[in-house]
A protein has these predicted regions:
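Acidic/polar, glycine-enriched structural segments that form the non-catalytic walls/loops
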Residues: 39-353
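Intrinsically disordered, low-complexity terminal segments enriched in Ser/Thr
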Residues: 11-13
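Positively charged n-region of N-terminal signal peptides that target proteins for export
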Residues: 17-24
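Methionine residue identity
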Residues: 1-2
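Hydrophobic h-region of N-terminal signal peptides that target proteins for export
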Residues: 29-38
Length: 353
């Protein structure tokens, strides 16, 4: 498709078979293309007019921030405040490339117990993992290897706003793709909230800035994995099978150690403002503040990290990364096209990147 002024042209090219004619044809086509070239595309304008914009709490409309190796999905509050309400829609996950878990294997199942041998035409029989039903142990082995290892939900970070998302009113949420920031505002029991959420481009770290008329509290919850392939990866009824231990704490930071079977990882919390971390359950902590303005970073890692980033530092790093990202590679601008399908086509092209 080529754009010229207010018109869009779909060009079908049938190349000549003769090589000499091909060269002439290609040269002529390039000259025409250059003569019709428009002004440089305003990439920022194109990206921003296609920013996802939500105005309701909808479990089928969740937004995410991430860096390619780590991501966090949020609800209409800009954080993971209602994970159970979103579990049947687009779940509020927090996952990384390194975050994998396997259930205990007390029966010591071996991979070869789930194998059948087939001839694939290469002169020998080769093993293939299957579900063997006629042998109970082999069936159990196959079932175990079907779900292990599996992706690990690292934890939910949400605002303490009760359990009913219907109490969240006047949602206005935008994913600012140009700067890599989710900007959310809403009303909860008459109180206005403004929330900014972003992700560091190189670290498995979320940063959030919350403003509200009144006190602010963050809920940090952890669930046991399910091993399922089409759920939210959270089993909230097995607290006895995992633990969350407070390793260290000072007035502006805390380190939590997560132990799930043989899987161990750490969660580093750092905040700007007056707040106190309290344990509310075996795998439930709450960061409480009387301040109306609180900034928090939450990093997940296999080892305790010495990185200490403020919200502003994470937001600036994300902005630099995403600004550069959108300024590289190809870009389309259908803003002047009169075809009614152009806007939707542009939206799909931009979001697919």
């Amino acid at each position: 498709m080529m754009e010229l002024g207010n018109y869009c042209f779909y060009i079908y090219i049938k190349q000549p078979k003769n090589k000499q004619m091909k060269r002439i044809f290609l040269s002529a086509f390039l000259l025409v293309s250059l003569s019709l070239s428009a002004q440089n595309i305003d990439r920022k304008q194109v990206v921003e007019r296609n920013n996802p914009h939500l105005v309701t709490m909808d479990s089928l409309n969740s937004l995410s921030v991430g860096n390619g190796g780590f991501a966090m999905t949020v609800d209409g509050t800009g954080l993971q405040s209602f994970p159970k309400s979103y579990s049947k829609g687009i779940p509020l996950g927090t996952m990384s490339d390194w975050g994998w878990h396997s259930f205990a294997n007390p029966e010591n199942y071996k991979p070869e117990e789930s194998w059948r041998y087939y001839d694939y035409g290469r002169g020998r029989k080769e093993p293939y993992a299957t579900q063997i039903k006629e042998d109970k142990r082999k069936k159990a082995a196959g079932d175990w290897y079907r779900v292990n290892p599996h992706r690990l939900h690292l934890g939910t970070l949400g605002l303490s706003l009760g359990s009913d998302p219907k109490n969240i009113q006047q949602v206005n949420q935008i994913l600012d793709m140009w700067d890599g920031m989710i900007k959310s505002s809403f009303i909860y029991h008459g109180r206005a909230y403004q929330v900014e959420t972003t992700c560091h481009p190189e670290l498995d770290m979320i940063a959030t800035h919350v403003q509200s008329k009144g006190s602010i509290a963050f809920d940090i919850r952890f669930a046991y994995p399910t091993g399922g392939h089409c759920d939210d990866a959270c089993d909230w009824n097995k607290d006895h099978l995992h633990s969350t231990m407070l390793v260290s704490q000072d007035k502006n930071s805390a380190v939590l150690k997560r132990t799930i079977d043989e899987t161990v990882y750490f969660v580093m919390l750092r905040w700007q403002g007056t707040a106190k971390l309290k344990q509310k359950g075996k795998n439930f902590y709450q960061l409480q503040s009387k301040s109306a303005d609180l900034k928090l970073t939450c990093e997940y890692a296999e080892q305790i990290s010495s990185e200490s980033k403020t919200f502003a530092e994470v937001a600036d790093a994300a902005k630099v990364y995403w600004n550069r990202y959108w300024q590289k590679g190809a870009m389309v601008d259908f803003g002047q096209c009169k075809d009614p399908r152009a806007q939707e086509m542009e939206r799909r092209v931009v979001l697919s990147q």
